[in-house]
């Protein structure tokens, strides 16, 4: 199993979510995050002074999938989240050793 973490633009969340549901995911976790990277922040003016805001709000989506679904799910995210501009985000893929559904004690794929 793999954990897919995607950092995307907030306005892309609904489009990405709908495409992922169509693609067969059973659920996902969504977290509001902030950070910086190559995307430059914005310059604001306050009381005559300019200052730079370089921490940008983003959305992080976390999905656990079987190994055979990793490519199709990442392609869906790329296709729907991409604008072609700096700041579109990143996808991180890592191994998941075990998943346990708390309510039923189901393990791994049965817990997804």
Curated annotation (Swiss-Prot):
Highest taxon of the lineage: Eukaryota
Compartment(s) where it occurs, according to its Swiss-Prot or TrEMBL record: Plastid, Chloroplast
GO cellular component: chloroplast; cytosol
Main location: plastid
Entry keywords, A to Z: Chloroplast, Nucleotide-binding, Phosphoprotein, Plastid, Transcription, Transcription regulation
Gene3D superfamilies per record: 3.30.70.120
GO function terms (MF aspect): ATP binding; enzyme regulator activity
Example GO BP: regulation of nitrogen utilization
Keyword Transcription regulation: yes
SMART domains reported for this sequence: P-II (SM00938)
Subunit structure: Homotrimer.
Family: Belongs to the P(II) protein family.
Functional description taken from the UniProt entry: P-II indirectly controls the transcription of the glutamine synthetase gene (glnA). P-II prevents NR-II-catalyzed conversion of NR-I to NR-I-phosphate, the transcriptional activator of glnA. When P-II is uridylylated to P-II-UMP, these events are reversed. When the ratio of Gln to 2-ketoglutarate decreases, P-II is uridylylated to P-II-UMP, which causes the deadenylation of glutamine synthetase, so activating the enzyme.
Name used for this protein in its record: Nitrogen regulatory protein P-II
Source organism of this protein record: Porphyra purpurea (Red seaweed)
Taxonomy of the source species: Eukaryota, Rhodophyta, Bangiophyceae, Bangiales, Bangiaceae
């Amino acid at each position: 199993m793999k954990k897919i973490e995607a950092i995307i633009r907030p306005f892309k969340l609904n489009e990405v979510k709908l495409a992922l549901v169509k693609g067969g995911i059973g659920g996902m976790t969504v977290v509001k995050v902030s950070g910086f990277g190559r995307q430059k922040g914005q310059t604001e003016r306050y009381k005559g002074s300019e200052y730079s805001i370089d921490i940008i709000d983003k959305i992080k989506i976390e999905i656990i999938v079987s190994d055979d679904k990793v490519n199709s799910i990442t392609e869906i995210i790329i296709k729907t989240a991409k604008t072609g501009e700096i700041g579109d985000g990143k996808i991180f893929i890592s191994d998941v050793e075990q998943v346990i559904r708390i309510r039923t004690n189901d393990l791994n794929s049965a817990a997804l």
